[in-house]
From Swiss-Prot:
It comes from the Bacteria. GO terms for biological process: iron-sulfur cluster assembly; protein maturation. Pfam families: Fe-S_biosyn (PF01521), NifU (PF01106). Its cofactor is [4Fe-4S] cluster. Belongs to the NfuA family. This is Fe/S biogenesis protein NfuA.
Length: 192
């Protein structure tokens, strides 16, 4: 799925040797399927691995990718390019800006779930978080639930209002209000 050159794999192995035990690599994409899509690579501590992640095995380490964004990383190449100035990792993802959601969803809930997975969760996943739609009632109230780094985060009020609610209300006229059903417990998993 993601082709990592031998030089880049050796570079990752070297970098990981200086990190806490069981730290791996995360490849992520922000704003997938849009002209503003951006890919990135980061360290992935063991406590930031999510149930929604796909694990890819390489020589001496694993790469984790959120399953909802894996199609955007099809045929991606990570390489270590060296020139006179030094070396730099490059990530080329030819499908990052493709819109795979062109199929017509059969329900508002499906459309909202797709929207959350494509527009909101890639941003939240950078902090180890995620949001899921629980239901939309007949009055247009969307019940959502946060998990991972978002659960118990002191910034959740801002994330709910400024990121999730604002984008859902502007994208779906049928939604009148967004309600957070998460039982927030602050802990080591919380981002802030």
């Amino acid at each position: 799925m993601i082709n990592i050159s031998k030089k880049a794999q050796e570079h990752f192995t070297s970098l990981l040797s200086n990190e806490p035990e069981n730290t791996q690599i995360r490849v992520f994409i922000v704003n997938p399927g849009t002209p503003n899509a951006e890919c990135g690579v980061a360290f992935c501590p063991e406590n930031e691995i999510e149930l929604s992640d796909i694990q890819l095995k390489y020589d001496g380490f694993f790469v984790y990718v959120n399953k909802d964004t894996i199609s955007y990383l099809k045929n991606s190449v990570i390489d270590l390019v060296t020139d006179k100035i030094g070396s730099q990792l490059t990530l080329k993802a030819p499908y990052a800006k493709n819109n795979f959601s062109k199929k017509v969803s059969s329900s508002l809930e499906e459309k909202v779930k797709c929207f959350l997975n494509l527009e909101i969760n890639p941003q939240l996943s950078m902090h180890g978080g995620r949001v899921e739609l629980i239901k939309i009632d007949k009055n247009g109230i969307a019940a959502i639930q946060f998990s991972g780094g978002c659960n118990g985060c002191s910034m959740i009020g801002s994330t709910l209002k400024e990121t999730v609610e604002k984008k859902l209300l502007s994208s779906f006229s049928e939604i009148k209000k967004v309600y957070d059903e998460t039982h927030h417990l602050h802990g080591q998993h919380s981002f802030y």
